[in-house]
Design a protein with these regions (language model features):
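Basic nucleic-acid-binding alpha-helical/helix-turn surface characteristic of O6-alkylguanine DNA
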Residues: 1-99, 145, 149-151
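Active-site and channel-lining beta-strand-loop segments
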Residues: 12, 122-124
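Short clusters of hydrophobic/aromatic residues that line enzyme substrate/ligand-binding pockets
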Residues: 60-62, 104, 129-132
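Regulatory, non-catalytic segments
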Residues: 102-111
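Short Lys/Arg-enriched helix C-cap and helix-to-coil transition segments
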Residues: 115-122
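…primarily DNA-binding HTH/wHTH and HhH modules…
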Residues: 125-151
Length: 151
């Protein structure tokens, strides 16, 4: 099932089943019908709180589809504190694979649940903002939102 969430950064297409969020990606101006259920209702509430500056982490059941390595990266991304960033190399080290920063970048790029799995918090080793599937402008806005609400 799918739902289009209208965020301040544009539409976010949220995929879900009866038990968990399975995807959350930026979308164009499409609209989708959705079946009311507790998972999507809670997701909408938490996204509203996040964009309103009152939520710093998400507490939702997630079922992202990916390889075991990708899933381990996505789990590690969820440990990056709100308002902070980590480099690809730091995430690789966190996984016990310090030479896997490129593989971490590849997994980060394949993250199917944007914002909720905070791939926007990963930056280049030199501190530069690097690719984000939702676009660098959105990444900048998300990081700015988090920094301004974490003081």
């Amino acid at each position: 099932m799918e739902y289009t969430y209208k965020s301040p950064l544009g539409d976010i297409l949220i995929s879900y089943n009866d038990h968990a969020i399975t995807g959350a990606i930026f979308d164009g101006q499409q609209t989708s019908e959705y079946a009311e259920n507790t998972v999507i209702t809670e997701c909408i509430k938490q996204l509203d709180e996040y964009f309103g500056g009152t939520r710093q982490s998400f507490d939702l059941p997630l079922e992202p589809k990916g390889t075991d390595f990708q899933k381990s990266v996505w789990l590690a991304l969820q440990s990056i504190p709100y308002g902070e960033t980590r480099s690809y190399a730091q995430v690789a080290s966190l996984l016990g694979r310090p030479k896997a920063s490129r593989a971490v970048g590849g997994a980060n790029n394949k993250n199917p649940i944007h914002i909720i799995i905070p791939c926007h918090r990963v930056i280049g080793a030199n501190g530069a903002l690097t690719g984000y599937a939702g676009g660098l402008e959105r990444k900048t806005t998300l990081l700015t939102l988090e920094k301004s609400n974490s003081l």
